[in-house]
Swiss-Prot record:
PROSITE patterns: PEROXIDASE_1 (PS00435), PEROXIDASE_2 (PS00436), PEROXIDASE_4 (PS50873)
Organism: Geobacillus thermodenitrificans (strain NG80-2)
Region annotation (Disordered) ranges: 1-29
Reported cofactor(s): heme b
Descriptive protein name: Catalase-peroxidase
Lineage of the organism: Bacteria, Bacillati, Bacillota, Bacilli, Bacillales
A Pfam family matched in the record: peroxidase
């Protein structure tokens, strides 16, 4: 028996205190695949972060010898390493691709993706087919990251390396803003598509519309298939995909042409041999590969024998120099269709002059043909793109400026307002895509704040109206790209003042009263501040009426944006098609309402307890869209009680679905309909995790705790976009 036990132990060591973490174990998700995913609300908590709790990246960045770092990066560009030699002796094109692909995952639909958290280090991005061999670029950067340590994040280093690469080859940039803070594990909240295979594309409707909120047209690609849609070499069809993808990144036609032409002025594509020679991506590579993937058995497996995209060749005869040769080649030749040594569709110039041949990546004395991708020829054969491209070709300075500006936008679009930018190269110019807000120059004393709150509460506006307006203004914030929020009071402006969810007629009435109050005040106070202060005053009143005398923290200093500072088309994507906090849903969707609530909470940067307490509080405060009764489980509307949770959990009631999708809350004995609810309301009693929070807040001894937690979560949302407060606090510490 003892020998048998020893044998069993040697076969399976997972017993006792050792837990089997292998992928073949059964998880809750396996048992219940439709289980609500709340983990996205806690994906970046302190437990995953190795820094001390008081670590402040912005403060560390201020200690950085920025110019020394740029010089080290400049030297790196031409310090070719035998383990991964630089094409043409210059790593610049590789680092441009790395930076571009870090930033290029951004999409305006939900603000997710982009360069601001350094997630190219993690799955799935580190193993996307389109990011093949960028693991080598990151390894080349490691000695510099090691040297400068906490003073420069990976996220900032990726983009700065791209900037230095452009500058080192004669290209123009207009600046750099630091401030991107690394995360320490993948961002699980981002939906990259439903496909189960790399390079598959099942994301278009029958009429060809790309699924919201995706921007890339193919799973595992940053943008579009360079060989053409579905691998078909049709430049005009490729132009349609390009236009839609870049539009969903927030780029117009001119910016699109500038980026493609400017980026392809440098470097080459790699397809020296069949893809069968290429090993697994980093996440699938053997442990001894130490995180490096795509190791190739073709020839030397590097240099001129490299296989990456499968397309082979440089675009220009001068692949490490900023010039006009991309357009010279694009418009100077006819192009014939062929396949690369790897079998990918590409185009070759007809009868090229010897001066227009490119150098070999390893041997500059050897000349090789250039090529164009199907997506490059889209710039020649799409009428609108062609107009822009020919204009750039005739105006080199305009092209250089357009590329520099588009590159800055590409690499900074997901950073939010300019107040977050760090470093000596931040451009002085304000850009419309940064959602600029005028600075304010007033301060308010506590006495003045109390006086304004009294005016607001005596204005005839109800607690419900004040809370609704403040929530509508602040809850546009997206933690993903730091856009939206109460600062700027853009709820006064198009398009927000026309959104259905904001009840335009009621909103106009509330704003009119705020404007009257503003005119009556002895000093200029922004409407943005008044909206938030009004909501805070209403919450205080509601808490007092519940028996709790509390203060809602308020920090003045918000500005009022103008319509001229507001890009209507850009802000249109912030319109919520569902807001479970207001029990609003524009129409029926394939995604359940409770999942849309969790997604909204994640974009607001909320935890599951914060989401729970806010929903419960907003219901009893009467914040529902158009005063819908669903989920308002109280007879004391406008009073900040825990009634939502108490009545949700009361076993005197049963919950009965109706044909309209609404649920009736009926007395079990009499059958009387007491309340109505949506799935968003019922999920707090149905989901075991959310029910545990609901039970916590329903306890008799947690009524005050509920009020205080609601206020903390409320203030978090109201101040979500107040990066100026963070900046001022940092400056006061360093002063």
């Amino acid at each position: 028996m003892e020998n048998q036990n020893r044998q069993n132990a040697s076969q399976c060591p997972f017993h006792g205190s050792i837990t089997n973490q292998s992928s073949n174990r059964t998880t809750n998700k396996d048992w219940w695949p439709n289980q609500l995913n709340l983990s996205i609300l806690h994906q970046h908590d302190r437990k995953t972060n190795p820094h001390d709790e008081e670590f402040d990246y912005a403060a560390e960045f201020q200690k950085l010898d920025y110019w020394a770092l740029k010089e080290d990066l400049r030297k790196l560009m031409t310090e070719s390493q035998d383990w991964w030699p630089a094409d043409y002796g210059h790593y610049g094109p590789l680092f441009i691709r790395m930076a571009w692909h870090s930033a290029g995952t951004y999409r305006i639909g939900d603000g997710r993706g982009g360069a601001s958290t350094g997630t190219q280090r993690f799955a799935p991005l580190n193993s996307w087919p389109d990011n093949a061999n960028l693991d080598k670029a990151r390894r080349l950067l490691w000695p510099i990251k090691k040297k400068y340590g906490n003073k420069i994040s990976w996220a900032d280093l990726f983009i700065l390396a791209g900037n230095v690469a452009i500058e080192s080859m004669g290209g123009k940039t207009i600046g750099f803003g630091g401030g991107r803070v690394d995360v320490w594990h993948p961002e699980e909240d981002i939906y990259w598509g439903a496909e189960k295979e790399w390079l598959a594309s099942e994301r278009h409707s029958d009429d060809g519309e790309l699924e919201h909120p995706l921007a890339a047209s193919v799973m595992g690609l940053i943008y579009v298939n360079p060989e053409g849609p579905d691998g078909k070499p049709d430049p005009k069809a490729a132009a349609r995909d390009i236009r839609e993808t870049f539009r969903r990144m927030g780029m117009n036609d001119e910016e699109t042409v500038a980026l493609i032409a400017g980026g392809h002025t440098f470097g080459k594509a790699h397809g020296a041999g069949p893809a069968t020679h290429v090993g697994p991506e980093p996440e699938a590579a053997p442990i001894e590969a130490q995180g490096l993937g795509w190791m190739s058995s073709y020839g030397k497996g590097k240099g001129s024998d490299t296989i990456t995209s499968g397309i082979e060749g440089a675009w220009t005869p001068t692949p490490t120099q900023w010039d006009m040769s991309y357009f010279d080649m694009l418009f100077g030749y006819d192009w014939w269709l062929t396949k690369s040594p790897a079998g990918a569709w590409q185009w070759m110039a007809v009868d090229p002059n010897e001066k227009d041949l490119a150098p070999d990546a390893e041997d500059p004395s050897k000349k090789v043909p250039t090529m164009m991708m199907t997506t490059d020829l889209a710039l020649r054969f799409d009428p609108e793109y062609e107009k822009i491209a020919r204009r750039f070709h005739q105006n080199p300075e305009e092209f250089a400026e357009a590329f520099a500006r588009a590159w800055f936008k590409l690499t900074h679009r997901d950073m939010g307002p300019k107040t977050r930018y760090l470093g000596p190269e931040v451009p002085k110019e304000d850009f419309i895509w940064q959602d600029p807000i005028p600075e304010v120059n007033y301060e308010l004393t506590e006495a003045e704040i109390e006086e304004i709150k009294a005016k607001i509460l005596n204005s005839g506006l109800t607690v419900s109206e004040l809370v609704k307006t403040a929530w509508a203004s602040a809850s546009t914030f997206r933690h993903s790209d730091k856009r939206g929020g109460a600062n700027g009071a853009r709820i006064r402006l198009a398009p927000q003042n026309e959104w259905e969810v904001n009840e335009p007629e009621r909103l106009a009435k509330v704003l009119s009263i705020y404007e009257d109050i503003q005119r009556e005040l002895p000093k200029k106070v922004s409407i943005a501040d008044l909206i938030v202060l009004g909501g805070s005053a209403a919450v205080e009143k509601a808490a007092r009426d519940a028996g709790f005398d509390v203060k809602v923290p308020f920090s003045p200093g918000r500005g009022d944006a103008t319509q001229e500072q507001t890009d209507v088309e850009s802000f249109a994507v912030l319109e919520p098609f569902a807001d479970g906090f207001r029990n609003y849903q524009k129409q029926e969707y394939s995604v359940p309402p409770e999942e849309l609530l969790v997604d909204k909470a994640q974009l607001l940067g909320l935890t599951a307890p914060e989401m729970t307490v806010l929903v419960g509080g907003l219901r009893v405060l009467g914040a529902n869209y158009r005063d819908l009764p669903h989920g308002v489980f109280t007879d004391r509307i406008g009073v900040l009680t825990n009634d939502f949770f108490v009545n949700l959990l009361d076993m005197d009631y049963e919950w009965v679905p109706t044909d309209s999708g609404i649920y009736e809350i009926r007395n079990r004995k009499t059958g009387e309909v007491r309340w109505t609810a949506t799935r968003v309301d019922l999920i707090f009693g149905s989901n075991s995790i959310l029910r545990s929070y609901a039970e916590f807040y329903a306890q008799d001894d947690n009524q005050e705790k509920f009020v205080r937690d609601f206020i903390n979560a409320w203030v978090k949302v109201m101040n979500a976009d107040r990066f100026d407060l963070v900046k001022k606090a940092r400056e006061s510490v360093t002063a």
